[in-house]
Amino acid sequence: MKKHIYIYSPSSAVRDKASFKRGVKRLEALGHAVEVDEAALAASQRFAGDDEIRLAAIHRAAASGADVALISRGGYGLTRILPGINYNAIARSIEKGTQFVGVSDFTAFQCAVLAKTGAVTWAGPAVEADFGTESEPDDIMAACFDDLITGQGEGTGWRLPKIAINSIAVGAGSIWAEGQISINNAVLWGGNLAVLSSLVGTPYLPAIKGGVLFLEDIGEHPYRIERMLTQLLHAGVLAGQKAIVFGQFTDYKLVAHDKGFKLQGVIAWLQSKIKARVLMGLPFGHVATKVALPVGCKTRLVVENRDAFLLWGHR
């Protein structure tokens, strides 16, 4: 099904123009009408143009009438321009059918839109890293993106790793039995841990109670991950959630003086501090295989033994 896809750059400058162009061509080859923003390849220092250029690109994406507004890449840059975004224009665009999709630094935009308007955006792929690969794009990523843009996606599932963490929140909307979880009517939200934790104390972090918070990151040692989780913990963000779902944490290196300090230990430590259920293994993050997740959407989290499901197409 042919869709209008608008590609823009709200964060870091495109580094690999060949990958960017390859991604555009792949989307066109799928039959979509691809419109590339006039400043998509702009560069100012590490950014895709100065703050005004990137703000204008966001607002052009909102005014484009596209079915999908897809970022070229993540990186850094959105947090510094959050005050300049016209959130009413973004909400109107979403109401008219534009789906804003991105990953990584895009978490700042998604959290801000949710906090300011309650509108749903999508955590998903980016052009350069996901569609612009030298090899064929990941099948699961491509299929999830297709489900997103055609409106066919109703949820996602994954296999939990063989790590026993036994605590579980048992409250309103939650059921716990041997090897089973059912959490209903919970807002799905989250994204990149470093970006999300940087929003604590600002008006751009949504005040979600009883939600399902998903997290991912890249290049962060487990002690840094723990420090950011501690910030969310002490700020009261984690206490209000029904579940914390860890995606993929990649590209970090353990050192000798860690002496056994690993990510699994961080997650077990976190579980000991909160009542919410902590799950692992969500296929989302700075990885080729990533699902698409509706940020701000009411969802159902179901676990049966080691099979986990996030469902938003069924009520």
Regions found by a protein language model. Give the residues of each.
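ATP/NTP phosphate-donor binding region
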Residues: 1-65
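N-terminal glycine-rich "phosphate-gripper" loop used for MgATP/nucleotide binding
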Residues: 68-84, 103
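Conserved anion/nucleotide-ligand pocket segment
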Residues: 120-194
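Internal helical hairpin/lid segments
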Residues: 203-256
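ATP/nucleoside-binding phosphotransfer catalytic cores, i.e., glycine-rich phosphate-binding loops
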Residues: 246-315
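N-terminal amphipathic/basic leader segments beginning at the initiator methionine
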Residues: 1-22, 157, 162-172, 183, ...
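Short, acidic/small-residue loops that bind anionic groups at enzyme active sites
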Residues: 87-112, 116, 120-127, 277
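Charged helix-capping and loop-helix junction motifs
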Residues: 50-54, 227-232, 258-266
